[in-house]
């Protein structure tokens, strides 16, 4: 047994040994999360097959660092109950994908999994919460914390390590089509709710990636991903509080 495979040793010892054995290409491969998980498989009845795109990517990089959105199913992903991964087939699909990654990694390194959690688990059979704007209207951070704790447990059961959570945006223009992903137009309330969401999720051992960027809610003309025409003071007073709260939550 190699040192990095010995579960009795500390994570630091195992990681140091593993890094010492990896090539530069393999290290780069561990930073790779280019693939959309919902595009790496085809489903027919209850059977799954991996796409050539997925196999080529794993083989090219000598492994795969992380896979985004394996369970995602919505019109954007073009997956539904007939073509996507329903809850009762999720373990089967995950095991197939992870097995391929491990067997085609020289050092047997498993991949991480990340998934969208804009308001609960964005998957077939996933538990959903009210959209953020509705959650913010409750003025109840503790209730939201419990909701994301339940969500985190579901993600954990699906072997998801990273939850991509809408938590940083402050609603500044109702014309913006993603305003429902904001907890509030008030930075104090938005910060309290964001901190609760991250705390609830991470209490289950699932890491939180708070999205999207500071001041994304400060759109120009309500256009998504447009420039934020603000000064430093507004950035600090309005848009930094949710980000700071998420950092304080760990």
Q: For the regions a protein language model found, what residue spans apply to each?
A:
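Glycoside hydrolase catalytic-domain context in secreted enzymes
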Residues: 1-250
